[in-house]
Amino acid sequence: MSQVTVGENEGIESALRRFKRSVAKAGIFSDLRRIRHHETPVEKYKRKLKQRSRNRRR
């Protein structure tokens, strides 16, 4: 779960931007899309390939 604390002098727009960035980095939307729709074997292979390359970079 992504969580962002808003500073005293920080605007809501910048906090929302930081939240969206953290959600994208965590991969929450891609997981949601995968759960809601049927995933073909080719899509599954491509997703796992991307995940492997992401893990190698870390």
From Swiss-Prot:
Belongs to the bacterial ribosomal protein bS21 family. GO terms for molecular function: structural constituent of ribosome. The lineage of its organism: Bacteria, Bacillati, Cyanobacteriota, Cyanophyceae, Synechococcales. One of its GO terms (cellular component) is ribonucleoprotein complex. It comes from Synechococcus sp. (strain CC9902). This is Small ribosomal subunit protein bS21. InterPro entries: Ribosomal_bS21, Ribosomal_bS21_CS, Ribosomal_bS21_sf. The gene is rpsU. It holds the Pfam family Ribosomal_S21. Keywords: Ribonucleoprotein, Ribosomal protein.
